[in-house]
């Protein structure tokens, strides 16, 4: 490149000021002109200016890699293998590694080392969890008992009595155990368990456990970013809520698989299909509806157009299966779960249950002396978070919007236990993909927070998990926004570079 001009230190300082956002309109115009001249190769800095630019680089980072390449007469950030090669035409080139010129510089191998170091401890805790929960499940004292009983009732034509506590308890005592576990999900889900009700309870428990393991593996295979197979597998194997859901015979892994498939479709711009698929997860409406609410605020109309008719079909089918009057009964049961001491037999939320929940509602219910005050504070906090997440997530791409909506949904969920946190694998895997980019510390922290907080919450006071979940939401929002801003600025640079070289962007 022929040196056609000199860019002095004062002008580079002006360039630096422009990146801090403190220039007036006239100066911003001059700054933009300088950047374009640098990209075009019409001006090059003198030695003093080059030193000033190097000082600037520590702040600018990856955002001006193309400018840096032109200043140093080097290849762009997309081709960094020749950074230490001699300058064409003679003369040695500066070989100081630019933090933004090499994507590997943004990688943090120590993060994988941290995960590997924590793995024995986490897997040891997982093993203990399985040793405790599997015998409980085999004795009929796990939540799988309610699914098995509900499936049996649908199979023998008693679906109209699914929410009759006395009838359900009688069947459960005959088939499983005398530990009451009332069915609290929509009727359509009970139909899924009708086939395995032909088997004995213990055999059905083992079969569903294996099915859940298969669903979990399939879910991770769906969403794992390229080249990160083993970290995704490690997170799956060491994330306590996943094991808790499988060992307890819960349907949270089914929801995880549905949500992962919906996330994949949504990321590929198939929003209608994603919305329709997510509607099948309405058996966990307390998680699905907050996601849908954010999609409404983000004006994802195609997603809503797919969700609405499928959700209506789910409700109509449930009404046909169990009777539409049973949907009203189901609604009253759900409202009964909303009180610390509900009025309906078998469906009240006991104090011990509220202490085992993990959402904001559980946190305020347990730390505030008045139940009504806790509900008001929960509502206000949830609305405030909804507004904040909606505004912060508006600029994100589809993939990160959906993942952020999932992180938000578990925090404001109406009724949520530790095993329901399995769906957090979606934002955790999304954060895992960002650990290979520059400025990825927030993404790394976002992965570690639920990974480490979940086992502590299980062993101590689960309702306090709302605090690290809140931190998780803030940190992962920061990680997603930082990535979005970097991608946006790099895209502007690439288009400017392509335009200057006469290549369509």
Where does each model-flagged region fall?
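Short, low-complexity, intrinsically disordered N-terminal modules
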Residues: 1, 73-76, 91, 341, ...
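Non-catalytic N-terminal targeting/anchoring module and adjacent flexible stem/linker
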Residues: 73, 86, 90-92, 100, ...
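Primarily membrane-embedded glycan-assembly and transfer machineries that use lipid-linked glycans
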Residues: 94-273, 295-425, 432-433, 487-491, ...
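Hydrophobic alpha-helical transmembrane segments of integral membrane proteins
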Residues: 116-117, 191, 237-238, 281, ...
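Membrane-interface alpha helices of multi-pass inner-membrane proteins
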Residues: 272-285, 289-296, 405-412, 448-455
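Membrane-embedded alpha-helical segments of transport systems
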Residues: 283-286, 313-317, 442-445
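Aromatic-enriched
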Residues: 432-505
């Amino acid at each position: 490149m022929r040196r056609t001009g000199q860019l002095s230190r004062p002008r580079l300082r002006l360039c630096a000021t422009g990146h801090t956002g403190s220039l007036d309109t006239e100066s911003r115009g001059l700054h933009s002109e300088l950047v374009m001249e640098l990209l075009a190769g019409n001006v090059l800095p003198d030695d003093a200016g080059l030193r000033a630019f190097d000082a600037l680089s520590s702040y600018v980072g990856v955002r001006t890699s193309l400018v840096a390449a032109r200043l140093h007469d080097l290849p762009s950030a997309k081709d960094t293998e020749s950074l230490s090669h001699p300058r064409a035409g003679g003369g040695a080139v500066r070989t100081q590694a630019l933090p933004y010129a090499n994507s590997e510089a943004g990688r943090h191998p120590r993060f994988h080392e941290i995960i590997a170091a924590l793995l024995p401890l986490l897997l040891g805790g997982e093993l203990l969890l399985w040793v405790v929960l599997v015998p409980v499940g085999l004795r009929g004292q796990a939540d799988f008992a309610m699914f098995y009983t509900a499936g049996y009732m649908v199979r023998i034509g008693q679906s109209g009595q699914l929410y009759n506590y006395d009838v359900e308890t009688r069947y459960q005592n005959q088939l499983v155990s005398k530990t009451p576990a009332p069915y609290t999900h929509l009727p359509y889900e009970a139909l899924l368990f009708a086939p395995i009700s032909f088997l004995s309870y213990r055999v059905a428990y083992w079969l569903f456990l294996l099915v859940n393991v298969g669903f979990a593996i399939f879910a991770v295979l769906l969403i794992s970013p390229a080249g990160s197979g083993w970290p995704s597998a490690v997170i799956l194997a060491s994330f306590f809520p996943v094991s808790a859901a499988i060992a307890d015979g819960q349907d949270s892994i089914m929801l995880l698989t549905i949500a992962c498939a919906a996330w994949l479709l949504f990321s590929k711009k198939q929003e209608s299909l994603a919305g329709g698929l997510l509607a099948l997860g309405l058996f966990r409406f307390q998680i699905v509806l907050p996601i849908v609410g954010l999609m409404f605020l983000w004006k994802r109309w195609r997603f809503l157009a797919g969700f609405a008719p499928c959700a209506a079909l789910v409700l109509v089918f449930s009404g046909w299966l169990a009777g539409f009057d049973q949907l009203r009964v189901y609604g009253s049961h759900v409202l009964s779960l909303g009180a610390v001491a509900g009025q309906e037999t078998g469906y009240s939320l006991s104090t011990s249950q509220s202490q085992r929940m993990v959402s904001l509602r559980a946190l305020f219910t347990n730390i505030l002396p008045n139940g009504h005050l806790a509900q008001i504070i929960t509502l206000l906090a949830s609305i405030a978070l909804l507004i904040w997440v909606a505004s912060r997530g508006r600029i994100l791409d589809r993939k990160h919007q959906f993942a952020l909506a999932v992180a938000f949904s578990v925090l404001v969920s109406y009724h949520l236990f530790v095993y329901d946190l399995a769906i957090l694998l979606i934002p955790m895997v999304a954060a895992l993909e960002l650990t290979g980019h520059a400025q990825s510390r927030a993404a790394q922290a976002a992965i570690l927070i639920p990974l480490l907080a979940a086992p502590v919450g299980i062993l101590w006071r689960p309702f306090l998990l709302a605090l690290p979940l809140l931190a998780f939401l803030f940190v992962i929002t920061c990680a997603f926004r930082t990535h979005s801003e970097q991608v946006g600025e790099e895209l502007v640079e690439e288009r400017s570079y392509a335009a200057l070289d006469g290549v369509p962007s």
